[in-house]
Every structure is written in C-alpha cells, then in structure tokens.
Swiss-Prot record:
Keywords: Acetylation, Acyltransferase, Cytoplasm, Disease variant, Microphthalmia, Nucleus, Phosphoprotein, Transferase. Residues 1-152 form the N-acetyltransferase domain. Residues 193-213 have a biased composition (Basic and acidic residues). Residues 178-235 are annotated as: Disordered. Its main location: cytoplasm. This is N-alpha-acetyltransferase 10. It is found in: Cytoplasm; Nucleus. Changing residue 43 to S: In NATD; decreased protein stability; strong decrease in N-terminal acetylation activity in vitro. Ubiquitous. Its EC number is 2.3.1.255.
Length: 235
C-alpha cells in the first residue's frame, strides 16, 4: 500500500472513489479547484497495482481575520481496504503538509452526526474536538458536527525532527572536515619520501643529472600505477 501526493491525473479516480463511498459528491471542477489551488495538500492511497483505494481532499481556508488553518473537504476509503489505518495516514499526511507549506495552526472538517465510525476516528484517534453543531448542514437535512484539530503538537514534533536532522548533518560534516584536516597534517608516505630523496640526489649530481632525472620519472610513474592498483583492489 502506498500513500502519495495526488496528481492532476488522479482527480477523476478520486471522484469515482467518492461516488462509491460517500453520499456527499462534488462536480469535477471542484476537484480541479483543490488540485490546482493547493496541490500540496491532497493525497491518495493506492494498492500494489496502482489503483486508488482512498483519498483525502484538502485545502486552506481563505479567512484574513483568522490564523492560517486548513480544511478537510472529503475523506474516503473503499470498503475493501478499511481497517488498515489508511484514513488516519491520509489525514496525518494532509495535516503535515498544511503545517510545512502554509504554517497551519489547526485543521477543520464537518461530519454527519450519524456517522459514528468517522466520529470515532476523528475524536479518539486524530484528536479532533467538536466546536459546534451546524443544523441541516447536509442536503438531506441532517445536522453536522463542525470539528477542529489543533496542529501545535504536530508542528512541534516536525520542528524537533528537523532540528535533529540538521544536527546530525552538522555532526557528519564535522567528522568529514576533521578527517580531511588529519589527512593534511599527516607525514608523507614512504613513496612520497622516496621520490623526494631521488629528486634531491638528481639536483646534487653533476653530469649524471639527466640520467638520474630519467630514472626518477620512470620510478614515479611506476609508483603511481602501483598505488592505483592497490587502491582499486582495496575498495
């Protein structure tokens, strides 16, 4: 099972999933409105064959008088794939994206008063709180619970995770820098010392300097080749 960000080509299959699972249905343009306006916030669950078995359709509320907050427009999981934790994972992923992309402080939704399974998920698992009852919210006249989930704790956890990740990155970089500095301060290898001695000998000699230079160049070339081969075999 895979959960990923919804793409434009997923929207028609999301609508099909909605029609199978929920009485609250939307025109295709409403899915495109979400997908194009807030592409980071909607997610789908797909099976091993890449078939969509669940989705969450989410957006940010555009209220200048309130703190930044998101809204879950629709959540659905096909009956064949329920009780696998997909709804919770979809909701958490959408909430996390709201925090990371828009600094959301809370997320809201509406749910039918008669939908006990959804109420249990929202209240007991996802820590949503009922904020008010909206009479006759649905087309058939049923009341809705307006619910909110505070995202402060999730935001703090994400922040700590990023801090630990950044700290770990600095530790790795520090170790690399120390290793480079240690290598730079180490004494020359036996091969390098040998080449230096031969170079000095060539400078001190008179008429034989040309021959010694040729010998030195030949030896240096051989040393480099041998060193390369040893390195390859060691790796």
């Amino acid at each position: 099972m895979n959960i990923r960000n919804a793409r434009p080509e997923d929207l028609m299959n999301m609508q099909h999933c909605n029609l199978l699972c929920l009485p609250e249905n939307y025109q295709m343009k409403y899915y495109f409105y979400h997908g194009l306006s807030w592409p980071q916030l909607s997610y789908i669950a797909e099976d091993e064959n890449g078939k969509i078995v669940g989705y969450v359709l989410a957006k940010m509320e555009e209220d200048p008088d309130d703190v930044p907050h998101g809204h879950i427009t629709s959540l659905a999981v096909k009956r064949s794939h329920r009780r696998l934790g997909l709804a919770q994972k979809l909701m958490d992923q959408a909430s996390r994206a709201m925090i990371e992309n828009f600094n959301a402080k809370y997320v809201s939704l509406h749910v039918r008063k008669s939908n006990r399974a959804a109420l249990h998920l929202y209240s007991n698992t996802l820590n949503f709180q009922i904020s008010e009852v909206e009479p006759k919210y649905y087309a058939d006249g049923e009341d809705a619970y307006a619910m909110k989930r505070d995202l402060t704790q999730m935001a703090d956890e994400l922040r700590r995770h990023l801090e630990l990740k950044e700290k770990g990155r600095h530790v790795v970089l520090g170790a690399i820098e120390n290793k480079v500095e240690s290598k730079g301060n180490s004494p020359p290898s036996s091969g390098e010392a040998c080449r230096e001695e031969k170079g000095l000998a060539a400078e001190d000699s008179g008429g034989d300097s040309k021959d010694l230079s040729e010998v030195s160049e030949t030896t240096e070339s051989t040393d480099v080749k041998d060193s390369s081969e040893a390195s390859d075999s060691a790796s």
